[in-house]
């Protein structure tokens, strides 16, 4: 027994250090100056690493910052350090680690407290024995894999590591696993597993009111065992606001077996004004657009925002658009959004033949509501579903169509009112080198709410359309970092309907946000799809090139290919069955400091079918200044 006890006393020292190191790991990017990311993507407090490893990390960072080559530790392109977690602890460092202590492991006993350990051993146990509630299945599988195998210092050391990892996979992110002094000659090993309890929640980087708000969003309480799924759900909820980014790291508490949760908040500016320009208009309303607006992200308290935007042509004559959006979280962690808009339209004279022309005026009004419900996800996967209702009162279709491609749509006629309901689902997945977004929703209109929501009113605006309809809309977008800081973006959006739709509900293509090189919404359809592929160069900096003092900027060039194929449901005589457009082009994106953004694209049409357009292509310009 003496030799075994002496050896296992050594194991106790080793495994305590290993468990403390892994217990300090975080599940999210955290305090950059105090942590290091290992090759497995785990964020570890630098202070818990062995002093020699800490020195290697600091030396490697210094070499990388100076651009002097490689340091003593290997670092991959994601900035992850290849760390030997056993370094400095003697793990596997001597041939004695592989010497068998017993020839066969018969049983493993898991205990919650060191005081429960029997120093004289626990003979007679076969297999796995424990008295834990909600015992993770992953841990049981790991322990079972060691039963029946020889026991050495090295295998016990690896057992502790594997158990800690299994606990993390089983929703226990912070545990201490110890092998105290004991007699193992019976073939039974006792492990002390201490599931860490919360000591306190520390919030950094915000004022007192926001600190209290963020802390109250974390449902785990002092003295409770930490569950990764619950903590991650709470963190995801806190980060639902676009004006706040909160990162988390676990740190050892003052008492043994406890853990502090540190929340580091990076507040972004929530209240601002902005103005801008873009050439996104349509025929007879002018292509130029002047934009001004404001956003109040926390004026009414956390998780309440109000935004307003005014858009018009440069002469303030043809289009005057007002839109207002209010968003608020609810106590039961759902979201409610209200959107209201009013567009006043007064066009240039429109030729109607015989040398005559006609002025088209009218207004379009919309009031919409969305009720959003976050669904269970993971650290890198957020899911949400929403219910919605739209009321639209359209008195002029010039806002939605290209005059040269009217097809069977009337510019004006009797007023049409739309009452429709929607059900949607969206998902965002964070990958190691990118992000993917998926959205699908169904829209249904029963029709018959009033005289303007009748088949007759719909027919007068769009031949073959009825007030009762149903259509699906789906989109997928993927952005990815490539080699040497190149990146790519791919997006596709599609739609299908059971009949002819009003112009405001059709899928449009053409313009800076769909198919470049064509005018805005030059093609429309009840069904079809459009897609874009973009390839971006690495960042350039005009500030560095021009040696501008105290200024930062980012300039990227891109090449793209855009295409669309659209069609209508119930065709009129001689109406084409589909409309196709496609283009290639180049562009740039320039962000100056944190207040000015500029985009420029030139698209050249490479194919068109049943669409009237300028085949020489066109530029698309947009700029926004924020104050």
Whereabouts are the PLM-identified features?
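Bacterial N-terminal signal peptides
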Residues: 12-26
């Amino acid at each position: 027994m003496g030799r075994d006890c002496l050896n296992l006393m050594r194991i106790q020292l080793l495994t305590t250090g290993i468990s403390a190191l892994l217990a300090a790991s975080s599940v999210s990017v955290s305090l950059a100056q105090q942590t290091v990311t290992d090759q497995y993507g785990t964020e570890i407090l630098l202070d818990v690493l062995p002093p020699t490893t800490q020195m290697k990390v600091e030396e490697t960072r210094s070499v990388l910052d100076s651009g002097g080559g490689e340091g003593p530790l290997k670092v991959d392109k994601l900035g992850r350090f290849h760390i030997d977690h056993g370094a400095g602890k003697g793990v596997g460092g001597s041939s004695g680690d592989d010497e068998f202590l017993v020839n066969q492991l018969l049983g493993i006993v898991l205990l919650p407290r060191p005081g429960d350990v029997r120093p004289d051993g626990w003979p007679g146990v076969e297999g796995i024995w424990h008295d834990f509630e909600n015992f993770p299945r992953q841990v049981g599988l790991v322990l079972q894999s060691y039963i029946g195998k020889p026991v050495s210092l090295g295998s016990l050391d690896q057992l502790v590591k594997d158990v800690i990892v299994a606990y993390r996979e089983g929703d226990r992110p912070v545990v201490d696993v110890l092998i105290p002094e004991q007699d193992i000659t019976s073939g039974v090993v006792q492990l002390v597993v201490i599931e860490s309890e919360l000591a306190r929640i520390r919030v950094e980087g915000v004022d007192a009111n926001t600190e209290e708000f963020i802390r109250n969003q974390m449902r785990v309480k002092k003295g409770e065992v930490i569950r990764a799924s619950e903590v991650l759900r709470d963190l995801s909820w806190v980060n639902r606001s676009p004006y706040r980014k909160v990162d988390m790291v676990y740190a050892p508490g003052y008492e043994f077996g406890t853990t502090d949760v540190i929340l580091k908040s990076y507040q972004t500016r929530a209240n601002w004004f902005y103005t801008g320009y873009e050439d996104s208009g349509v025929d007879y309303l002018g292509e130029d657009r002047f934009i001004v607006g404001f956003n109040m992200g926390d004026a009414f308290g956390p998780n309440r925002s109000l935004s307003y935007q005014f858009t018009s042509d440069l002469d303030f004559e043809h289009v005057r658009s007002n839109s207002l959006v209010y968003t608020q979280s609810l106590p039961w962690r759902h979201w409610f959004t209200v959107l209201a808009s009013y567009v006043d339209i007064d066009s240039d004279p429109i030729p109607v033949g015989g040398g005559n022309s006609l002025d088209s005026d009218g207004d379009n009004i919309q009031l919409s509501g969305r009720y959003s419900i976050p669904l269970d996800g993971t650290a890198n996967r957020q899911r949400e579903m929403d219910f919605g209702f739209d009321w639209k009162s359209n008195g002029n279709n010039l806002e939605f169509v290209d005059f040269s491609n009217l097809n069977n749509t009337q510019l004006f006629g009797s007023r049409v009112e739309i009452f429709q309901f929607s059900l949607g689902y969206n998902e965002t997945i964070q990958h190691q080198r990118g992000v993917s977004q998926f959205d699908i929703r169904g829209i249904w209109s029963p029709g018959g709410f009033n005289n303007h929501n009748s088949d007759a009113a719909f027919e007068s605006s769009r031949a073959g359309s009825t007030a009762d309809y149903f259509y699906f809309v789906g989109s997928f977008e993927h952005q990815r970092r490539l080699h040497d800081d190149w990146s790519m973006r791919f997006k596709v959006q599609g739609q299908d309907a059971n009949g002819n739709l009003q112009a405001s509900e059709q899928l449009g293509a053409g313009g800076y946000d769909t198919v470049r090189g064509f005018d805005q919404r030059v093609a429309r359809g009840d069904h079809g799809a459009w897609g874009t592929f973009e390839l971006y160069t690495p960042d350039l900096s005009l500030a560095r090139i021009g040696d501008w003092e105290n200024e930062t900027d980012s300039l990227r060039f891109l090449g793209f290919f855009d295409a669309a194929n659209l069609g209508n449901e119930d065709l009129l005589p001689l109406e084409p069955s589909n409309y196709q457009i496609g283009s290639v082009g180049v562009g740039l994106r320039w962000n100056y400091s944190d207040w000015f953004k500029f985009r420029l694209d030139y698209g050249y049409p490479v194919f068109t079918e049943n669409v009237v357009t300028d085949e020489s292509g066109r530029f698309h310009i947009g700029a926004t200044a924020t104050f």
